[in-house]
Amino acid sequence: ATEPPVVIPMHSAFGNKLLARYVFDSVVVTNHQAEAPNIYHYIPPKGFPRKLQDTDAVPWNQKKLACMFAANKFAVSRNELYTERRKIIKCFEKNCPENFDLYGAEWPNILSVYKGYAKDKFRTSQKYRFSICLSNVTHVKGCLDEKLFDAMFAGTVPVYQGVDEITEYVPAECFIDYRQFSSPVECLHFLQEMTCKEYEQYRKNIVRFISSEETKKRFSAVGMASAIEAAACAPKKYSERKLWILKLLLLYDKMYHKLCALNRKIEMRKMMEIDA
């Protein structure tokens, strides 16, 4: 499983406990739930190791300030980061529209910074100094997605929030921790004031990290296969009770997405009214 609970509720602590207790002996999924000891978690960044892009393809003084690659999603969860993404977009659109671009699905065209889909995410990213990389959710241990790594491989410096224990995976000197800012405006000012020398130091740190043998081993497909082989056990045979529990979880997942769709309509209407 590679999605957090805000996308697939079955991956929540509640869902994991039911799966571990009633459906499987051991499941290789995506989290570190202490209360569900039969659950093992591993999310490798997609496509790792990817070839490092030419980090000097676009000179510093020709790069725009920042970009974001994200879909316009909504979720009914106190840990979701979709709302914070929209706050950042609004802030950057208001204060530096000429230096920020947004790419992704389902954004309203009334946003002046919206550029639609990027044909090549990595080549597009090279045109920017920073990439805003907020995950779908926070406070879900081990839920490390591809956004942070995509930015680093493209040669940009990521502004990241997601996994609370991120420095267990990636050194602090390789990214800008969005949690240090009290508001999107404070983050914007920090990025605008960074010197070329400071920026290049981040990029040197990134190259050193992603080029290391330890990183390649930990986040490669081979590394994932090894983790699965070490953790996985044979599943129990299905019984009628287990099938009923699984169907209940699938129904829970379906109802959650209907609620999210309703929330999306309400929030989109609010966005349109504000811009009007």
Residue spans for each PLM region:
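Pol beta-like nucleotidyltransferase catalytic core
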Residues: M10-L102, E106, I110-A276
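Active-site proximal beta-strand in glycosyltransferases
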Residues: A1-P5
